[in-house]
Amino acid sequence: MKFTLINEIIQHFKGDAVVVFSNSNTVFNDDNIQQLIKLNHFDSKPGKVLLLNLVSGFKSKQVIVSGLGDAPISAKNYVKALNAVIVILVEIKAKNLMVQHVGIKGFNELWVHEITAKVMCNATYKVQKVGNYKKQNSGIERITIQSTMDSVYGLMKGQAIADGMSLTRHLGDLPSNVCTPSYLAGTAISLAQEFNLECEVLEEVDMEKLGMGSLLAVSKGSSEPPKLISLSYRGNGNEKPIVLVGKGVTFDSGGISLKPGTGMDEMKYDMCGAASVLGVMRVIAQIKPNINLVVVLPAVENMPAHNASKPGDVVKSMSGKTIEILNTDAEGRLILCDALTYVKKFNPEVVIDIATLTGAVVVALGKYNSGLMSNDKNLANDIISASKVSLDGVWQLPIEDEYDELLQSNFADMANIGGSSEAGSITAGCFLSRFTQGYRWAHLDIAGTAWVSGDKKGATGRPVSLLTQFIMDQVQKRL
């Protein structure tokens, strides 16, 4: 799919189709289109589309009218309109089309280009059956966007983000017998070779030498060897890097604290944090900003076995702090805490961990916003700002002493869960915060946003867009 910009009257475009937009107050400025909208009782609601054939005055074969809802046009309604358009374009097998320029309140034209490319590329992603993997092809070959600008940077960035999201979704959708810790390591190595990045993979023996007793307590019940994967992009000399840590539990049975059987197949998605940081690295490696980025993936499988960790076991983390494992199904924090200690070697500017960490965040925030926690107000505000630009929402949750005290243990420095069923997402974040001394840190709980269930089951690619925007915002701050 190729994107171009052109300053041309849309009626003059010769192609398979053109896309125009309509909202509750105004319709596309063409008498024939306005009459056809009235005749078809088109109400311009977001997500509604009207397909018109051989419209007088248009050189394209078909015209697609997409609703934008009430004025002023919102970014979210524009995204809904684009997603609806893609469905029609695929149905009519359009190869060459033009999209009308639309002004979005609060955003500039570069952003419109970026979001258009990102949404239209991402909307064509298809979940593929195992053993029948093919290069994604929607049939759409060229999309021309009406614009008075010459810069294609927004288009390039949007396509790169969609490419990173596609990698994240593909990894998440793979079955856990394919996407193992070793598979994630292989993917990182392939990215390093493709984009000339630095890659290091620590094996179990290396982690034992480093004293990662918490991480290894999770992997010990599985026949799949654990991996600690790091991938580095250097775009700005010796500047302190942004470090992203992605939880990579390639399958989470719960361990000895076994999960219920219903829906357990979806626990292959417990590595979506790791998948997302690989997706972000793919984006950054293509955009090539002047910044340093390191992504770290603690990758394990959590399984029950005769040698698996048991409730009540006490383990020693890389930090030297001891942890009482009250629930082996609260394993994500056990691998992340050692990774958060390990990343100090990179002398980070900031560290953000991304994890499908708690079911409690789904209860609190549903599938719309990822949970955000941070030990630094400015960092949290930067992430919130990036979420608004990227339309990849977050909602901040507190870190306070009252919640942290719930992790008290009589037998270790801390327990891996709180003493009650309350505030599960917050106590998980408090647990992680105990391992982040010495650097600015934020935590994204993506358990509700990383994938969807039901008939359209599949990974979403979130929060690749958010993290990319955050990184690019940091680049701008340093200019």
UniProtKB/Swiss-Prot annotation:
A GO CC annotation given for this chain: cytoplasm
Gene3D superfamilies, A to Z: Leucine Aminopeptidase, subunit E, domain 1, Zn peptidases
Keyword Nucleus attached: no
Protein keywords: Aminopeptidase, Cytoplasm, Hydrolase, Manganese, Metal-binding, Protease
GO biological process: proteolysis
Broad class of where this protein is predominantly found: cytoplasm
CDD domains (UniProt xref): Peptidase_M17
Catalytic activity: Release of an N-terminal amino acid, Xaa-|-Yaa-, in which Xaa is preferably Leu, but may be other amino acids including Pro although not Arg or Lys, and Yaa may be Pro. Amino acid amides and methyl esters are also readily hydrolyzed, but rates on arylamides are exceedingly low; Release of an N-terminal amino acid, preferentially leucine, but not glutamic or aspartic acids
Cofactor info, note text: Binds 2 manganese ions per subunit.
Family annotation (NCBIfam families): PRK00913.1-4 (NF002074)
Similarity section: Belongs to the peptidase M17 family.
HAMAP family: Cytosol_peptidase_M17 (MF_00181)
Name the record gives this protein: Probable cytosol aminopeptidase
Species of provenance: Vesicomyosocius okutanii subsp. Calyptogena okutanii (strain HA)
